Amino acid sequence: MKNLVVFGTESHPKLTESICEHLCLDIGRVELSKFSNGETSVRIKQSVRGCDVYIVSPASGQVNDHLMELLIMISACKTASAKKVTAVLPVFPYSRQPDQKFSFSGAPLSDLQDAVVPCKKQTGYHPWIAQSGTLVADLLMCSGADHIITMDLHDPQFQGFFDIPVDNLFGRPLLKHYISLNIPNYHNAVIVSPDAGGAKRATAIADALGLDFALIHKNRRHEYGTSLMLVGDVQNKVAILIDDLIDTAYTLVRAAEFVKEHGASKIYALVTHCVLSGDAIERVKLSCIDKLIVTNTAPQTITPSGCFDIIDVAPTFAEAIRRIHNGESISILYDHNQVWV
C-alpha cells in the first residue's frame, strides 16, 4: 500500500511484526535507545514525508518508558512532515485509573439515628486521585497524534477525553468466534460476568450466541463486608467467564470458585487483555478455571497448552489500519459475525 508506514515501540515487537505481515509491509525502520541517564532517544531511519504513519505500542511491561517512546516517535514523525500519525494502542495506558475525588466513606448512609452524623477529624486536606486518563489523552494529542486505535477500553468514557477520532475496537467478535469453534457443547453454556461493570460486554456475547447470561453481584453494604450474589443459573452447565482484563487474577479466580460452588460443571475464562503480574499464572493454574483464553494485545509469557490458549488480534488491527488508510468504513469490525484470521 502506497505511503503507509507502520512503526512499533519496544513494548510488543511480535504484534507489530504480525500486523505488518498481514499488511504485506516491512516494519518501519526506527532506532530506539537510551542515554546513560535513562532518557529515551528516537531516530526515524526512513522518510515519512507525506506518509500515513501508524505506531503500535500497547501498554505493557515498562509502561512509562514505552509511553515516552510513543510520544517521542509521534512528535518525530510529525516533525518529519508525516501527513497523518495514528497511535495504535491495543492496551490503552492508564485506562484503569479513575478520574474522581478519593473518598474514604464508601457507600452513603442508609439511615440516621438521633439526627447525629459521626464525623472524623478533618485535617483540612482532601486527597485526590490524579486525572491520569485525561493527562495521557492530552499528552497524545500534544505530541501530534491525529487518530487513536485501541481495543476494549476499560472505561469507554475515555474516548471523551480526546479531541481527535478514537476507534475503540471490540474483542467480542474474537471471543464469540473462539467459543463457537473451541468449546464443546457450548450451547449448554452460560455467559457469566464477574462484576456489574462487565455486564454489557458479557450480555453482548450471550445475545450473539443465543446463550443464557448470569451476573456475579457484589453487595458492599453487607454488615460483614462485601458479599457475592449470583443472578442467574449455572447448575450443571458450562460457565464462561468474560472480562476485559486479568492482572493479579484475584477477581477472576474468586468468580470461578463462586460459580463452581453454585454447581457449574466446567469453567472457561475469556479475557481480552492479559497482564498476569506477580504469581497470577500459578494462581490460575491452582484455581478451578479449566481453561483461560486471552488475546495477545499485550506480550504473553504463557504458551498455548491444556490450561491456556491465545487469540491473535493482529488480523483485526491490520484490517482496521488497511480500512482507515484507504478511507473505508470500519463498522464491519464491530460485527459479531465478522472475524479476521
From Swiss-Prot:
Keyword flag Kinase: yes
Segment forming the signal sequence: none
Database matches in InterPro entries: PRib_PP_synth_CS, Pribosyltran_N, PRibTrfase_dom, PRTase-like, Rib-P_diPkinase
Any Gene Ontology biological process: 5-phosphoribose 1-diphosphate biosynthetic process
This protein's record includes keyword Ubl conjugation: no
Positions with a binding annotation for Mg(2+): 152, 154, 167
Alphabetized Pfam families for the sequence: Pribosyl_synth, Pribosyltran_N
UniProt cross-references to SMART domains, sorted A to Z: Pribosyltran_N
Subcellular location: Cytoplasm
Pathway membership, UniProt: Metabolic intermediate biosynthesis; 5-phospho-alpha-D-ribose 1-diphosphate biosynthesis; 5-phospho-alpha-D-ribose 1-diphosphate from D-ribose 5-phosphate (route I): step 1/1
GO molecular function, one term: kinase activity
Catalysed transformations (reactions): D-ribose 5-phosphate + ATP = 5-phospho-alpha-D-ribose 1-diphosphate + AMP + H(+)
Any one of the GO CC terms: ribose phosphate diphosphokinase complex
Function: 5-phosphoribose 1-diphosphate synthase involved in nucleotide, histidine, and tryptophan biosynthesis. Active in heteromultimeric complexes with other 5-phosphoribose 1-diphosphate synthases.
Family the UniProt entry places it in: Belongs to the ribose-phosphate pyrophosphokinase family.
Protein name: Ribose-phosphate pyrophosphokinase 5
